[in-house]
């Protein structure tokens, strides 16, 4: 399964070469993605999957939101893909204030897509809203959010990605533009112009998980995290890379995604109700230990093998750790 960033695709009927040609919009491209994904299966049993990312301000967002539902026709639906709608604080504020959201074709608003998720986005967005020379349309923020939530509830496969928070809390100095299939990994990416392009960047998920349900003591995490980090780091060097843009960035960043499973089992073993405040405190405690031991293992590995090639491109190189952007006020807001 893969993540696809389609947010740069022009909106339907956008002018090309000064109006000489009009763009066909996102749906024909999504049809192509869908066909490509479906031709890849594991022994004919498990098919390929993809999640496609779009900004909430995209010109075709209203049509994008309904692409998975069982209404419409095969011509205007792309049901075999999943979708991630990217939102930032500005749009939540407009929802709260019952204001409008202005929709753009990315090509008509230069730099807007590149700024999305970064501090400079808001000023640029407001500037383009006032520019009468740029094609645009508006929709009520509450109407659009309700449509998003309705389709999310009915299809179960439309995700919400808070793109500004992904960058604020990211470990990277490079911008995060998208996520992966399941939305748990956020790594920097750059478009490739051809299959041998060495300037682009394709992010790979190097993943494993620790089963918390089997723990008898939280201190056992130290050895488990160390083993996980070392095993995955070996895989990075061992595996083959058919695409240069994936090989270069993976070897240079050496990003690992190590999570935990069996959380409900772990809470039950500790006689904690899943929805209680005590559960939130326990999850915070085990997550903090988990993160600490993973960082410790990574540091020990760097002492043995030297730091990764692109270490200076991370916030770690400036002494900024995940806990430094963590908001304590959110910890005890669970019901």
Locations of the language-model features?
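Aromatic-lined, polymer-binding surfaces characteristic
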Residues: 253-260
